[in-house]
Design a protein with these regions (language model features):
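Post-DEXD/H (motif II) to motif III coupling segment of the RecA-like Helicase ATP-binding lobe
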Residues: 1-26
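Short glycine-/polar-rich loops that comprise or flank the Walker A/P-loop
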Residues: 16-17, 55, 110-111, 153-156, ...
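C-terminal accessory/interaction regions of large nucleic acid-associated machines
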Residues: 230-476
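Conserved C-terminal RecA-like helicase domain
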Residues: 18, 35-46, 51-139, 163-174, ...
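SF2 helicase motor core recognition
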Residues: 125-130, 140-155, 179-188
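A short beta-strand-to-loop transition that corresponds to the Sensor-1 phosphate-sensing loop
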Residues: 2-6, 61-64, 142-146, 196
Length: 476
C-alpha cells in the first residue's frame, strides 16, 4: 500500500516491478469542510471555535515556532482552567524539572493541552499521543508529525497554517491532514476547519527515484544504481563521478548520506593546502577546541553540513563548534542541557526557544548528523594525507562518544524507543542491565522484567509501560 490520495505511478515502475496499480477511493468516515475567517483576528476566531465545538481537536501548525506562538496566544486570550488529571500534572512537572518551568510544552500540559512536533523527546511525543487517544488531552497542536508516522485521529482537525516548510500545502499533503479527521467506529463524521481555501485537486503522482531516476534524483543514489538503471540523460553525470581520480568510488558510495560532490569539494580544499596547514587536521580521539573548530569549518563550508546543522538550530560553524565543545567538556547530558538553556535565556532567548534549540541540537546534530559528517571527513582527510605521505588522523572515537552523548551505547536506541535517559539511568543503577550489554541483551532484559518500581509517580510508570509495550512486552 502506497498511501492515501495517490492516483498514479510511472509506467516504468509498474514495468520494472511487474505490478499492477489499483486505486481505492473508499472512505471509512465522511468529512465535512468548514471555512473560518482570519479577520479581524485569526487567533480569536480559533478560540471561538474551540469554545463551541465538542470532541477532541487536532490543530495543524507549520513549525514548532508556530505551535509556540499559537499556544501562547490562546492562553493569553482565554482563561483555560488547570487540568485536574494527575498524570498530566505529573508530566507537566517532569518536563518542568528536566527542561524549564516556562517551556510552553509544560505550561500547556498544566491546562490539559498537548503539543507534538519533531523536536520533542520521543517519550514525550509518545505520551502526548497516548494521552490524546485516552481523552486526557482534548486539544493537540501538531506540526507535520500529524501526517508523518503519528497514528492518531480526532473528530475535528483545524488547519491553522496552510504551509509546510514555508511552502503552500499541496493537495496530497492537505488530503493527508484532512484524513486525520473522524475515525471509524468512534465518530463517523469528521470535521475539518480551514482559514484558507484548500489546494486545488490535482493528479497525485508518486515517483520512485530508485526505480525511475530523473534530474532531481540525488547523486548519492545515482552512483549506487546499476548501469542499466541509469537513464542515458544522466549517464554523463554519473560517469564523471565514477571516473574521477580524486577520491575512491567506494568512499563516495560508503557515505551515501552525503552528496559525492560535497565529498569531492572537501578533498579539493584539502589537497590545495600547504603541508603545514594540512597537518593541522592530524588529530585523534581527544581534540582541543581548535581541532573541533577546524573540522567544523570544513563540514559547514565544503561538506554540505550547513543545511542539516541549521535544522538543528546551529547558525554558524563557530556556534556548532562551541556547542560540541561544551557538550564534550561537560560529558553529562543533563548538565549540558541545563547550562545551555540557562546561558541562552541570559542572552534574552525565550525559555521555549532555548529548550527546543538544545533538544534539536542533541537529537538532530550531536547524536545524528555531526558523527555522520565527521566520519565522512575522517575518510576524506585520511585519503588526502596518504596521498601527501603524511600520518593519518582518527576522528572516529570522538565521533562515537558524541553520537552516544557520553552514555552507554544502548541509551540512544532506548531513547528512540521511548525510554528517557533519566529512566535508563535508574535501570542501569538498579542493575537491570549493564552498561556494556549489547542492545539485544538490554531489550530482552527490559521486555521480560517488571519495571514499574523504577518509575516515580504515574507519569514515569506509564512511560515505562508504553516503552515495554513498544518492545513487545505483555503488560497485564
Amino acid at each position: 500500500m502506497l498511501g492515501p490520495s495517490i492516483k498514479s505511478i510511472p509506467a516504468i515502475v509498474k514495468e520494472k516491478l511487474n505490478c499492477k496499480f489499483l486505486i481505492e477511493d473508499f472512505q471509512t468516515v465522511a468529512v465535512e469542510l468548514h471555512f473560518l475567517k482570519k479577520k479581524p483576528n485569526k487567533d480569536e476566531a480559533l478560540a471561538n471555535l474551540l469554545d463551541e465545538i465538542d470532541g477532541q481537536t487536532m490543530i495543524y501548525c507549520q513549525s514548532p515556532a508556530s505551535t509556540r506562538k499559537l499556544i501562547k496566544s490562546y492562553l493569553d486570550i482565554r482563561e483555560v482552567e488547570m487540568t485536574q488529571d494527575g498524570e498530566l500534572l505529573e508530566a507537566a512537572k517532569w518536563t518542568s524539572d528536566n527542561y524549564h518551568d516556562e517551556w510552553l510544552v509544560s505550561v500547556a500540559l498544566r491546562h490539559g493541552i498537548g503539543i507534538h512536533h519533531g523536536r520533542l523527546p520521543r517519550a514525550l511525543g509518545r505520551f502526548m499521543i497516548r494521552a490524546f487517544e485516552e481523552g486526557k488531552i482534548k486539544i493537540l497542536l501538531c506540526t507535520s508529525t500529524l501526517i508523518e508516522g503519528v497514528n492518531t485521529s480526532a473528530k475535528n482537525v483545524v488547519v491553522y497554517d496552510s504551509k509546510l516548510n514555508r511552502r503552500s500545502l499541496d493537495f496530497f499533503t492537505f488530503s493527508n491532514i484532512k484524513g486525520r479527521s473522524g475515525r471509524m467506529f468512534r465518530h463517523f463524521m469528521g470535521n475539518i476547519f480551514v482559514f484558507d481555501a484548500p489546494p486545488e485537486e490535482e493528479l497525485p503522482f508518486v515517483d520512485m527515484p530508485a526505480i525511475n531516476p530523473g534530474e532531481n534524483t540525488p547523486s548519492s543514489l545515482l552512483i549506487n544504481l546499476s548501469e542499466m538503471d541509469v537513464p542515458s540523460t544522466l549517464r554523463e553525470k554519473v560517469d564523471s563521478l565514477l571516473r574521477q581520480k580524486l577520491l575512491p568510488v567506494e568512499l563516495l558510495k560508503q557515505h551515501s548520506g552525503i552528496e559525492p560532490e560535497y565529498l569531492l569539494d572537501a578533498a579539493k580544499t584539502l589537497i590545495s593546502l600547504e603541508v603545514r596547514e594540512l597537518e593541522r587536521y592530524v588529530w585523534a580521539s581527544r581534540p582541543v577546541y581548535d581541532d573541533i573548530k577546524l573540522t567544523s569549518d570544513l563540514i559547514w563550508t565544503q561538506l554540505g553540513g550547513a543545511a542539516a546543522a541549521r535544522q538543528s538550530s546551529m547558525r554558524s560553524a563557530s556556534m556548532m563548534t562551541f556547542w560540541i565543545w561544551r557538550l564534550y567538556s561537560s560529558r553529562n547530558v543533563p548538565q549540558f542541557r541545563r547550562e545551555m538553556i540557562i546561558s541562552q535565556i541570559e542572552r534574552n532567548t525565550s525559555p521555549d526557544e532555548a529548550v527546543e534549540n538544545v533538544l534539536a541540537f542533541l537529537r538532530g546534530w550531536a547524536s545524528f548528523n555531526y558523527p555522520k559528517y565527521l566520519a565522512a571527513l575522517n575518510d576524506v582527510v585520511n585519503h588526502v594525507l596518504q596521498l601527501k605521505g603524511l600520518s593519518g588522523c582518527n576522528y572516529l572515537p570522538f565521533a562515537m562518544i558524541i553520537e552516544h552523548l557520553f552514555q552507554p551505547s544502548s541509551f540512544s536506541a532506548l531513547e528512540e524507543y521511548g525510554l528517557p535517559t533519566e529512566i535508563s539511568e535508574k535501570l542501569l543503577n538498579g542493575r537491570v542491565f549493564n552498561k556494556d550489554d549489547s542492545l539485544d541483551v538490554v531489550v530482552n532484559n527490559l521486555r521480560n522484567r517488571k519495571l514499574d518500581r523504577f518509575g516515580d509517580g504515574i507519569f514515569e510508570k506509564r512511560v515505562i509501560e508504553d516503552f515495554q509495550r513498544g518492545i513487545g512486552a505483555k503488560i497485564s
